[in-house]
Design a protein with these regions (language model features):
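Surface-exposed acidic, glycine-flexible loop patches that form ligand/cofactor-binding
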Residues: 52-55, 153-163, 204-209, 281-285
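Aromatic/hydrophobic pocket-lining residues that form the small-molecule binding cavity
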Residues: 195, 199, 265
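N-terminal secretory targeting modules
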Residues: 1-96, 283-285
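Conserved SGNH/GDSL esterase-like catalytic core that processes O-acyl groups on lipids
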Residues: 86-188, 222-226, 259, 263
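Generic structural signal for well-ordered alpha-helices
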Residues: 199-203, 232-233
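Extracellular serine-dependent O-acyl
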Residues: 214-285
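Sec-exported extracytoplasmic/periplasmic mature domains
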Residues: 70, 109, 113, 172, ...
Length: 285
């Protein structure tokens, strides 16, 4: 795990030195959620070394839309299992590699695009992401860069670049938060209808782009009220599409008041892997 605090200059990091002769493999990944980014310039190797061809990417493809849990936030704080998060952790415990979404992809031998952003809700101006001008998934799901501070500002995503076989949609945990006001109440009929319609509009648009994909709607084991799960279940039923399902973990909404740690992330991945595996090979293009 490498951290650095310089934003405007090239940094050279020693990955390995004095290796024995032979074939070596490097796996490079970004630990934090989608709004964190770095520019990868390249590898420097020994003058006597050579770069071999990468093995082909898996044919199976998963895409995940989620929040901090899907991004693996605070998952390495293993001394705080089933507890609130450590104070002022500043992201040092984040590791997307150990998110249930990425574990599931590895379990199933699939590529994954993990569009997971900590604090995000469905609606703009709700949730916790990008205070005080909160940005919701309704403005994020179809963007490559979705925050105005990016080097090129907000940029659209070309859905032709990646067509998943399976879409995981795990948003809803942060939606009660209404900064400076009472939390949104999913049991209120008017709000419930508004929230469900916004959620469905995203799914319907994604379905139009991925007509053959299997969609799995879910919330995670981070504590939340069961009415949110019921609302997601209603959405799945109302969409009336046999390839759009609602999945619940054994401990959905009940396992921890803080972010899921490594044991809980792997627990979720095991259950989600089994769920997708039980659908058979037909879900993969």
């Amino acid at each position: 795990k490498v951290t650095f605090d310089k934003n405007d200059e090239d940094i050279t990091l020693d990955i390995a030195c004095d290796l024995e002769k032979g074939t070596h493999t490097v796996t490079l990944f970004k630990r934090q959620d989608a709004s964190h980014y770095f520019e990868f310039v390249g590898f420097e190797i020994d003058p006597d070394g050579e770069v071999l061809e990468n093995p082909p990417l898996p044919a199976r493809k998963i895409e995940c839309y989620g929040d901090s849990v899907s991004a693996g936030a605070v998952c390495e704080a293993v001394d705080f299992v089933a507890s609130c998060d450590p104070e002022d952790h500043q992201g040092v415990y984040d590791n997307a590699w150990h998110s249930y979404a990425m574990i599931t992809a590895r379990n199933l031998g699939a590529q994954i695009h993990n569009i997971a952003q900590g604090g995000i809700a469905i609606f703009d101006n709700t949730g916790y992401y990008h205070a005080p001008n909160y940005i919701g998934m309704e403005s994020v799901y179809n963007k490559l860069c979705y925050f105005p501070e990016g080097a090129k500002g907000v940029t659209p995503w070309d859905f032709e670049n990646y067509t998943p076989d399976v879409v995981l949609f795990a948003v809803g945990q942060n939606d009660p938060h209404n900064e400076g006001h009472e939390d949104f109440d999913i049991t209120d009929p008017d709000y419930r209808a508004k929230w469900k319609n916004a959620y469905k509009s995203i799914i319907i648009d994604l379905r139009s782009k991925y007509p053959n994909a299997t969609f799995v709607l879910l919330l995670t084991v981070l504590c939340h009220g069961e009415e949110w799960d019921k609302a997601v279940d209603e959405i799945a039923n109302e969409l009336n599409d046999e390839k759009i399902t609602h999945f619940m973990f054994t401990r959905t909404g009940k396992a921890t008041p803080g972010h899921p740690r490594l044991p809980e992330q792997y627990e979720m991945a095991e259950e989600l892997t089994a769920y997708l595996s039980n659908m058979g090979d037909k879900i993969w293009g």
